[in-house]
Amino acid sequence: MNIQRAKEIVESPDMKKVTYNGVPIYIQHVNEETGTARIYPLDEPQEEHEVQLNSLKED
């Protein structure tokens, strides 16, 4: 996923279907400098991770 699209998803009021390794996730924050996003699985909000944007897929 590119940085611009990830930022659009974060700013959107609508929930978008995004996955990380096949797991549905929520994007909390996009770091443009490092090309990463802070995410968590929808079913485990306490499990935050910092991942590369190119590992995220929009369904």
Swiss-Prot record:
Induction: Expressed only in the forespore compartment of sporulating cells. Disappears after 45 minutes of spore germination. Expression is sigma G-dependent. Coiled coil: none annotated. It is found in: Spore core. The keyword RNA-binding does not apply. Pfam families: SspH. GO terms for biological process: asexual sporulation; sporulation resulting in formation of a cellular spore. It comes from the Bacteria. Keywords: Sporulation. GO terms for cellular component: endospore-forming forespore. Its main location: other. Transmembrane segments: none annotated. Belongs to the SspH family. HAMAP family: SspH. This is Small, acid-soluble spore protein H. It comes from Bacillus subtilis (strain 168).
